[in-house]
């Protein structure tokens, strides 16, 4: 009956909808696509349709239902160099899948797959080839006896091609793949599935039936699972009868837009040009989904993948002759193309286009500089780009190594990757040496001996003083038996009430004491689970094995705990107010403030800042209790606890929960309830790198101190300006307006003085080939006045004038100013004010630039002013002497 509902399926949307409808009618629950950013912090991106179900297959999470079906967006970049080159490699793709969790198995999976492709998609059996694992007799029997497929259409392959596993150990099983034959007339005598022109694999059925142990032994799983995947783009190519995936309706509208912008016809262009179009089509889909799912361009992890894709797009746009910014235009087409199936694209439209524009503008300048240097290397005939030169491109010009390799490869030139890595390592060593210090660096004996100590037990969650035994003493990074008065040492204890610096939170300070000795502890760090208590022995002697008492400074612990809880609340508020995809990129929890770094493509607005503050303060007033529990990591993640990507967690994790507000994996110290924070205030918001913003904020006593100081300043300003606090804004506004007007009047007077004082200078101009040259030193004028004087002199001398003025505005500052002003006729004969002034300023250790008819510059070496002006005059004379006025 289902087959009669759809007469002809052609479009990508129809293919997707038909797949989901088909399996829904077979009692599969339709699961929406998961984010490209997985919940699992150990995985960078969603690379397969089954990834969201991996915890279910591994028995770590309850199944959403016995049967499920989905259209999952995925990204893979391992074959990025093949994108656009082959007919079907992509970074972004959609994987249609049907899944069984301990319900049906091979028979139903094979039967339904066959019904779908032959009855719903109406593929002819004459165009289908099936591969199976060579030991999977059960699948072979089903295909031949129940489906009725010709045995000649079955290809048996080995474990490499037709046996799936999740790793060296764990669930695994054989698979059966369906291939489409574009040339069935060639017959079945020689079937080579590696022939990409003839065959395309479009549906993979994985039968998870075994568990592999560490010895490689296979045992049957108690519950057998089905995991299938059909590439939407590949099925579109087949049903739309296209020669490649890029010309299907899923991607081609983006290519058409790029074709229109570049004024190049896609179909009549050569293969190399088509590759650039295809890369734009593919990468556009990837970047819009990455940004919509919360990824911001950066130099790390997912952010670097996004940046790399965007930079490839800019470059291939340039190869198509597109000189202007264009990525937002083609991204808009991609969003429009997919927003019905992925509404988040429409909701995040502004964010996506903004992020793309920022990155495009930034990279265009980099690309221009790097390409120029690469062009010089290529034109020189070299066949190898040295590691030094590749590193120079990377370090000086910001040119990614992958892009250098790509451009070099297009010109049959190799890159010395090992040499590049050596240069990179050398730079890291230089940076390390430059920033080295003696403050608790793990060097000498400490590096070797730290592993000898057992893990330090932290007992300071609720108790700020406790007894402990000294396990070791480090003096100048070497183990010693005792510590004496005046020595700075690092003490290792068996247990401690001091919190050791980790997770962004600073360590506690306080004292370690015995009956007759005391250490002032000013820093505690954690190295390999061993706490190092760093401090100076105030008096007495401490020895290894001695029992002592640890006493934490309670005031500073309270402040740090308040700031840590405030950091959790801040992240939740940012997710609610700014973007649900906000994620932590770094943090600092200190005694006096907190700092939170997060992904964002643009600054947080003042209105958003106010809303974030208001939300956090409302949670503080509501007196939410904090619930801290240890639990299995999988349980914590299932409950929605936030985990920081890249952070290593054990199987057991500590969860800090503010019910209904925030839940994070965290090992830091916190308050008992939110009201202990008192209040919360954001004091700054700024960008610290591409795609990363930083907020600094205060809570508790620090926030109260901040408000008190601000109140004092407001009162002082009120007295100074003779205005009530509520009138300060208007009063300052009026003063600014008055100041602007006064400055305009002053500048006008300066210009008039300069005009009357220097207007007679035009009479000293030298005539060369009918052009008037005036080069002079004028001191005591600021930039605006010097500019005004030059323009007035040019006006007096006419279209054939060349005026260069230089001078010292203020002798105390020892700085120079230069201006060059050229008449229209001087510009017509090829003279350029911007180039002239750059040459002049460089003589005096300066620089500048400007337009062909006017430019200005600054410089530092006032002793060379006379020489620079003489050079300028001689240069102009020679230029004009060689000119013949026709």
From Swiss-Prot:
Tagged with keyword ATP-binding: yes
Enzyme Commission designation: 6.1.1.7
Organism superkingdom: Bacteria
Cofactor note (record): Binds 1 zinc ion per subunit.
Residues reported to bind Zn(2+): 564, 568, 666, 670
HAMAP family: Ala_tRNA_synth_B
Pfam family, one: DHHA1
GO biological process: alanyl-tRNA aminoacylation
Family: Belongs to the class-II aminoacyl-tRNA synthetase family.
Domain notes: Consists of three domains; the N-terminal catalytic domain, the editing domain and the C-terminal C-Ala domain. The editing domain removes incorrectly charged amino acids, while the C-Ala domain, along with tRNA(Ala), serves as a bridge to cooperatively bring together the editing and aminoacylation centers thus stimulating deacylation of misacylated tRNAs.
Record-level GO cellular component terms: cytosol
MF annotations from Gene Ontology: alanine-tRNA ligase activity; aminoacyl-tRNA deacylase activity; ATP binding; tRNA binding; zinc ion binding
Matching InterPro entries: aa-tRNA-synth_II/BPL/LPL, Ala-tRNA-lgiase_IIc, Ala-tRNA-ligase_IIc_anticod-bd, Ala-tRNA-synth_IIc_core, Ala-tRNA-synth_IIc_N, Ala-tRNA_ligase, Ala_tRNA_ligase_euk/bac, DHHA1_dom
Cofactor(s) the record lists: Zn(2+)
UniProt keyword terms in alphabetical order: Aminoacyl-tRNA synthetase, ATP-binding, Cytoplasm, Ligase, Metal-binding, Nucleotide-binding, Protein biosynthesis, RNA-binding, tRNA-binding, Zinc
Reaction equations catalysed: tRNA(Ala) + L-alanine + ATP = L-alanyl-tRNA(Ala) + AMP + diphosphate
Annotated protein name in UniProt: Alanine--tRNA ligase
NCBIfam families documented for this protein: alaS
Main location: cytoplasm
Organism of origin: Prochlorococcus marinus (strain MIT 9215)
Cellular compartments annotated: Cytoplasm
SUPFAM superfamilies assigned: Class II aaRS and biotin synthetases (SSF55681), Putative anticodon-binding domain of alanyl-tRNA synthetase (AlaRS) (SSF101353), ThrRS/AlaRS common domain (SSF55186), Translation proteins (SSF50447)
Free-text function comment from the UniProt entry: Catalyzes the attachment of alanine to tRNA(Ala) in a two-step reaction: alanine is first activated by ATP to form Ala-AMP and then transferred to the acceptor end of tRNA(Ala). Also edits incorrectly charged Ser-tRNA(Ala) and Gly-tRNA(Ala) via its editing domain.
PANTHER family referenced in this protein's UniProt entry, alphabetically: ALANINE--TRNA LIGASE, CYTOPLASMIC (PTHR11777:SF9), ALANYL-TRNA SYNTHETASE (PTHR11777)
């Amino acid at each position: 009956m289902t087959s009669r509902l759809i007469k002809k399926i052609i479009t990508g949307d129809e293919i997707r909808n038909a797949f989901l409808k088909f399996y829904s009618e077979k009692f599969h629950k339709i699961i929406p696509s998961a984010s490209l950013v997985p919940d699992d912090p150990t995985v960078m991106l969603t690379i397969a349709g089954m990834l969201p179900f991996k915890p279910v297959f591994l028995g770590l999470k309850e199944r959403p239902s016995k049967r499920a079906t989905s259209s999952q967006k995925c990204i893979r970049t391992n074959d990025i160099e093949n994108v656009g080159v082959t007919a079907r490699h992509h970074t972004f793709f959609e994987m249609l899948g049907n899944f069984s969790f301990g319900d049906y198995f091979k028979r139903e999976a094979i039967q339904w797959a066959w019904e779908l492709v032959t009855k719903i998609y109406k593929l002819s059996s004459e165009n289908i080839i099936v591969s199976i694992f060579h030991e999977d007799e059960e699948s072979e029997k089903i295909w031949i006896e129940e489906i009725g497929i010709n045995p000649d259409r079955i290809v048996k392959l080995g474990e490499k091609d037709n046996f799936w596993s999740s790793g060296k150990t764990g669930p695994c099983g054989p698979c059966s793949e369906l291939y489409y034959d574009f040339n069935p007339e060639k017959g079945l005598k020689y079937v080579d599935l590696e022939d990409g022109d003839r065959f395309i694999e479009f549906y993979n059925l994985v039968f998870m039936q075994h568990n592999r142990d560490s010895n490689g032994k296979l045992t049957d799983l108690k519950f057998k699972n089905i995991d299938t995947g059909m590439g939407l783009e590949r099925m579109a190519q087949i049903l739309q009868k296209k020669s490649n995936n890029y010309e299907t309706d899923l991607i081609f509208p983006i290519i058409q837009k790029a074709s229109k912008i570049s004024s190049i016809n896609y179909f009549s262009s050569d293969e190399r040009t088509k590759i650039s179009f295809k890369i734009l089509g593919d990468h556009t889909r990837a970047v819009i989904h990455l940004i919509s799912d919360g990824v911001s361009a950066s130099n790390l992890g997912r952010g670097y993948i996004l940046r790399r894709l965007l930079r490839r797009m800019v470059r291939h746009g340039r190869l198509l002759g597109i000189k202007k910014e264009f990525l937002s235009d083609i991204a808009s087409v991609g969003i429009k193309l997919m927003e019905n199936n992925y509404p988040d694209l429409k909701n995040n439209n502004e964010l996506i286009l903004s992020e793309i524009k920022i990155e495009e503008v930034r990279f265009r300048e980099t690309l221009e500089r790097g390409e120029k240097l690469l062009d010089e290397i290529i034109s020189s005939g070299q066949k190898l780009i040295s590691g030094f030169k590749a590193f120079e491109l990377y370090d000086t010009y910001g040119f990614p190594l992958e892009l250098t390799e790509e451009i070099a490869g297009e010109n049959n030139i190799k890159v010395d990757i090992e040499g590049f890595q050596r240069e990179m390592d050398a730079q890291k060593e230089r940076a390390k040496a430059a920033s080295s210090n003696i403050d608790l660096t793990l060097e000498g004996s400490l590096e070797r001996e730290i592993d000898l100590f057992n893990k330090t037990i932290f007992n300071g969650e609720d108790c700020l003083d406790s007894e402990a035994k000294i396990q070791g003493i480090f003096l100048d990074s070497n183990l010693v038996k005792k510590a004496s008065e005046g020595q700075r040492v690092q003490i290792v204890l068996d247990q401690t009430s001091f919190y050791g610096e980790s997770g962004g939170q600073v360590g506690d300070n306080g004292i370690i004491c015995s009956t007759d000795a005391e250490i002032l502890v000013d820093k505690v760090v954690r190295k390999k689970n061993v706490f190092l208590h760093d401090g100076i022995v105030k008096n007495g002697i401490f020895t290894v094995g001695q029992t002592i008492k640890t006493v934490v400074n309670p005031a500073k612990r309270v402040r740090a705990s308040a700031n840590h809880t405030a950091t959790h609340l801040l992240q939740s508020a940012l997710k609610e107010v700014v973007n649900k995809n906000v994620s932590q990129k770094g943090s600092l929890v200190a005694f006096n403030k907190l700092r939170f770094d997060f992904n964002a493509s643009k600054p947080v607005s003042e209105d958003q800042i106010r809303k974030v503050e208001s939300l956090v303060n409302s949670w503080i007033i509501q007196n939410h209790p904090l619930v801290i529990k240890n639990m299995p990591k999988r349980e914590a993640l299932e409950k929605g606890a936030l985990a920081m990507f890249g952070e290593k967690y054990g199987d057991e994790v500590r969860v800090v929960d503010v019910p209904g507000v925030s839940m994070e994996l965290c090992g830091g110290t916190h308050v008992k309830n939110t009201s202990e924070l008192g209040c919360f205030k954001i004091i700054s918001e700024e960008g610290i790198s591409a795609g990363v913003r930083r907020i600094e904020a205060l809570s508790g006593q620090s926030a109260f101190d901040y408000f008190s100081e601000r109140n004092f300043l407001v009162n002082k300003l009120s007295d100074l300006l003779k205005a009530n606090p509520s009138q300060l804004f208007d009063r300052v506004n009026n003063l600014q307006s008055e100041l602007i007007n006064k400055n305009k009047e002053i500048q006008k007077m300066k210009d008039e003085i300069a005009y009357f004082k220097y207007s007679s200078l035009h009479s000293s101009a030298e005539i060369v080939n009918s052009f008037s040259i005036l080069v002079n030193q004028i001191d005591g004028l600021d930039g605006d006045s010097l500019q005004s004087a030059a323009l007035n002199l040019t006006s007096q001398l006419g279209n054939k004038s060349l005026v260069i003025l230089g001078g010292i505005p203020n002798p105390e500052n020892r700085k120079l100013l230069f201006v060059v002003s050229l008449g229209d006729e001087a510009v017509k004969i090829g003279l350029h004010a911007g180039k002239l002034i750059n040459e002049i300023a460089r003589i005096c250790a300066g620089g500048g630039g400007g337009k062909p008819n006017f430019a200005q510059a600054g410089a530092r070496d006032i002793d060379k002013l006379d020489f620079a002006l003489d050079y300028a005059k001689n240069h102009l004379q020679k230029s004009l002497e060689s000119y013949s006025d026709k």
